[in-house]
Amino acid sequence: MSKEVLSKSKEKMEKAEQALTRQLGTIRAGRANASLLDRLSVDYYGAATPVNQMASISVPEARMLLITPYDKTILGEIEKAILKSDLGLTPNNDGSVLRLSIPQLTEERRKELVKEVKKEAEEAKVAVRNIRREANEELKKLEKSGDITEDDLRSYGEDVQKLTDESIKNIDSITKDKEAEILEV
């Protein structure tokens, strides 16, 4: 039962790390990345449909995204959605595809993005700490019910802390890599 608590905690912590990686992938770092458009949806026959499900998104150059819709009639809607979004990008519509040029980031914008990255990382760390707290509470319940001894509680508590430390270290590494990518000129 207590090993189950550890494995569930490890799984949840890994999910928190993966969520951070996905979230940081949507932050524009001056390089073209198809995940920039992940949060973008277009009204398609009355349903909000993600752009990546209605178009092929490729990266032909380091600073350009090429959006080729499967249905050419939706091209204008995708263009409007990009213009309305907070991406700050202007699409170039040539009638069959959209080209998105990713401009160089200003120093000020880089600093804003680094702050955003740190905020996201802190939220991930809080999530990991909450998972640790839940695991410790679960272990204490097991000890109270007599399923594990006090020594086991201490030992498993140390294991939970090791998992937490490892996860926080991974989050710091992910964050550091993203910050370096943003600050790279």
UniProtKB/Swiss-Prot annotation:
Kindly give the CDD domains that the UniProt entry links to this protein: RRF
GO CC annotations? cytoplasm
Coiled-coil positions = none
**Subcellular compartments:** Cytoplasm
The keyword Ubl conjugation belongs to this UniProt entry's keyword annotation: no
Mainly localized where?
A: cytoplasm
Pfam families registered for this protein in UniProt: RRF
UniProt-listed InterPro entries: Ribosome_recyc_fac, Ribosome_recyc_fac_dom, RRF_sf
Instruction: Extract one GO molecular function annotation from the record.
Output: ribosomal large subunit binding
GO annotation terms (biological process): translational termination
Which superkingdom does the taxonomy of this entry point to? Bacteria
Keywords from UniProt, A to Z, are:
Cytoplasm, Protein biosynthesis
Q: What this chain does, per the record? A: Responsible for the release of ribosomes from messenger RNA at the termination of protein biosynthesis. May increase the efficiency of translation by recycling ribosomes from one round of translation to another.
Q: Spell out the family assignment given in the record's similarity comment.
A: Belongs to the RRF family.
**Record's NCBIfam families?**
frr
- Give the protein name, as stated in the record: Ribosome-recycling factor
Give the organism the record lists: Listeria monocytogenes serotype 4a (strain HCC23)
